[in-house]
Curated annotation (Swiss-Prot):
Residues 105-128 are annotated as: Disordered. Binds together with bS18 to 16S ribosomal RNA. The lineage of its organism: Bacteria, Pseudomonadati, Thermodesulfobacteriota, Desulfuromonadia, Geobacterales. The keyword Ribonucleoprotein applies. Belongs to the bacterial ribosomal protein bS6 family. The gene is rpsF. This is Small ribosomal subunit protein bS6. HAMAP family: Ribosomal_bS6 (MF_00360). Keywords: Ribonucleoprotein, Ribosomal protein, RNA-binding, rRNA-binding. Pfam families: Ribosomal_S6. Residues 117-128 have a biased composition (Basic and acidic residues). One of its GO terms (cellular component) is cytosolic small ribosomal subunit.
Amino acid sequence: MRMYETIFIVQPDLGEEELKGISARVQEVIVSMKGELKRLEDWGARKLAYPIEKFNRGRYYYLRFDGDAALIAELERRLRLNDKIIRYQSVKLEKEAPAAAAIPAKVTEEEPVEAAPEAKVETTTEEE
């Protein structure tokens, strides 16, 4: 099984019951196609970069799941057929991202910077 992530945007004017119904149907598709849902996040309503179907705002959802090609095809088909969903994008992830603690920080030693010697200004007076 491969890991995928999907972000979809729903219309901003939907009620809580409709939003729960949409997320339940998405979860149902993943489970029915023998996928494993890792994460489902509601990112809330945000301003869109440009108007989509006369909407300036949208409610964003983020999914991360394991599945096969048939699952992603069926999920995208269902997202496309739902007129309450105005955009979606699915991406195949190469592998699980390592935790930040697992990546060693690159340590560099800094040499102390010595202050530049102050320049002395000499003034000469001309004698007649």
